[in-house]
């Protein structure tokens, strides 16, 4: 293997973790602030503990899997999280499980909802994810 090949291979190996790492550090405070200000359409990254699994229900366009998430820091808010199973597949969460989510927060008085927790195939919306059990659902 030539020196050029070794340098290229080293560069490629060093680049893979950065390219594969799509998660962002959670900022539960952003969710708490959006809730307090009654704001919607706020892109958030949050983490917490699943307090209730709502299961899969038919949505307006496609089925969604829902669960309630108690935020880990910032405030003790419980938000509903919805995942479009056409994109993420079934996640299969359990109560007490730690989860991180990225999506769009929508206010409502009982805590709000985080949706768009998946990629947008049309590219019109920022993609989201759910990270659970060491696996990333997009």
Roles of regions detected by a PLM:
Residues 9-17:
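Bacterial N-terminal signal peptides
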Residues 20-138:
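OB-fold and OB-like single-stranded nucleic-acid-recognition modules
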Residues 1-8:
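Bacterial N-terminal signal peptides that target proteins for export
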């Amino acid at each position: 293997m030539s020196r050029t090949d070794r340098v290229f291979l080293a560069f490629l190996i060093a680049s893979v973790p950065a390219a594969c790492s799509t998660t962002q550090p959670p900022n539960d405070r952003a969710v708490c602030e959006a809730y307090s200000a009654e704001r919607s359409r706020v892109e958030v990254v949050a983490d917490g503990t699943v307090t209730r699994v709502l299961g899969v229900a038919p949505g307006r366009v496609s089925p969604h899997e829902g669960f309630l998430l108690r935020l880990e820091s910032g405030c003790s808010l419980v938000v509903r999280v919805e995942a479009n199973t056409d994109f993420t597949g079934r996640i299969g969460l359990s109560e007490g499980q730690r989860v991180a989510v990225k999506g769009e927060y929508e206010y409502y008085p009982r805590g709000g909802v985080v949706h768009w927790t998946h990629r947008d195939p049309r590219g019109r919306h920022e993609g989201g994810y759910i990270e659970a059990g060491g696996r990333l659902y997009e």
